[in-house]
Every structure is written in structure tokens, then in C-alpha cells.
Amino acid sequence: MTAPASLQAKAVGIGMTSQRVRDRLVERLRECGIQDERVLTTIRIVPRHLFIDEALALRAYEDTALPIGHGQTISQPWVVARMTEAVMQVAPKKILEIGTGSGYQSAILASLGLEVYTIERIGKLLRQARKRFRQLGIKIRSKHDDGSIGWTEHAPYNAILVTAAAPTLIDTLIEQLAIGGRLVAPVGTASEQALVQLTRTIDGNITHEILEPVTFVSLLPGMLD
């Protein structure tokens, strides 16, 4: 895995955004069970501080979720790593992300060499994310739409990653998953959620596995500008 040169240049930080601080975060993730070195290396390289408000930059490499406005958050790095590790186990080439948010998870996936399609229902967040993608030289296909309907034009996907919680897994998204593909999503209520891994096996069957308890914002229908 080789990140774009422009991304590596932008990744240089100082003080609480320095490489030393990022290395500490990566070691914490490793201690907390993240094993895929490709994922850890990508988290070390991708500059999380550029995906949040400048006022929060000093907290960028804490292992915690942070607000990005509009009632949304940039996910905790451990959660990003865990979800990414889960989808990477099926060696995907093309992935659909539901909920672009800040664009950080999208950037992680693209920097791993995946062909990324991402959908965001809040127009302002998507415009900000697109600007970051351009600045970092990352190629990501994005769409302003209701994420719960997926993106059928480019289906099927080897992996689907959902970054907001619904009460159940969404059939429309499962239908867009390729044979041998994997969907990872938080499922549950506002007070109780779990990260669920769904795999469509080679013979076409569906298997489910509960990975971890998590807390995500709710997956909402419709679109906002």
C-alpha cells in the first residue's frame, strides 16, 4: 500500500499532530486488538487532523469520536480500524460507503487501494469532504443522496461499510453486495448497538456475526443541503 505523494506531504504535522503522536495512536490500536498492518500503516499516514475543525486539531489523534457539525461525528480511530480490518479480510476491490461524513473513513479506504464509492445525505458535509479529497489528491467517487438506497449504478460491491446505525440491516444494501462480499454496519437503537458483519458466501448464502458493541449516530432517510 502506497499513499499518494500529496497525501504523504500533507500528513506532516507538528506538536499534537506530529508523526510521533500518530505513532502512539497506532500502538494503542495495536494493543486494543487491531492486527492488520495495512490498516495500521494507513491510519499512521492519513492526516486525521485535516478532517476535523481546526479548533479540535490538538485532539485529532486521541482515540475518540469528535463532532464535525450537523449532529454528526468523525468516528473513533479504533472503530475506523476495526471496520476497515473487517472488510479487508475479503480482499475487496470496490467498496460502497454509506455516510461520508468528514471523509476520513473514505480516505482510509482509498489509501488502501480500494475503488471507493461514498454517499452522504448532508450536502454541506459532502462538499467539505470533496474539498479534502482534492487537496490530498485522493480519487473517490461521491454522491449526495439518501444512503439507505445505496448506489445501484455501480453495484455489485465487494464490500459495503455503513457509518450510521439502523434498527436492522438494510435489504436494499445487501442486494448490492457481490458474491463473496462483506457488509459491516452498526445495528440497533440509540441506546444499544452492535457492529454486525454480514458475508455473502461463495454459494450465495448469508452469514452474520456480531463483532463489537458500538455507538453511532442514527442512519436517517432523505437529503439535506
From Swiss-Prot:
Top-level taxonomic group: Bacteria
HAMAP family documented for this protein: PIMT
GO CC, one annotated term: cytoplasm
Active site: S75
NCBIfam families tied to this protein: pimt, PRK00312.1
UniProt key word Protein transport: no
EC number assigned by the record: 2.1.1.77
Name by which UniProt lists this protein: Protein-L-isoaspartate O-methyltransferase
Pfam families in alphabetical order: PCMT (PF01135)
Enzyme class name: transferase
Function: Catalyzes the methyl esterification of L-isoaspartyl residues in peptides and proteins that result from spontaneous decomposition of normal L-aspartyl and L-asparaginyl residues. It plays a role in the repair and/or degradation of damaged proteins.
Compartments where found: Cytoplasm
Key words of the record: Cytoplasm, Methyltransferase, S-adenosyl-L-methionine, Transferase
GO molecular function, one term: protein-L-isoaspartate (D-aspartate) O-methyltransferase activity
Family under the similarity heading: Belongs to the methyltransferase superfamily. L-isoaspartyl/D-aspartyl protein methyltransferase family.
GO biological process: methylation; protein modification process; protein repair
PROSITE patterns per record: PCMT
UniProt keyword Heme present: no
Catalytic activity: [protein]-L-isoaspartate + S-adenosyl-L-methionine = [protein]-L-isoaspartate alpha-methyl ester + S-adenosyl-L-homocysteine
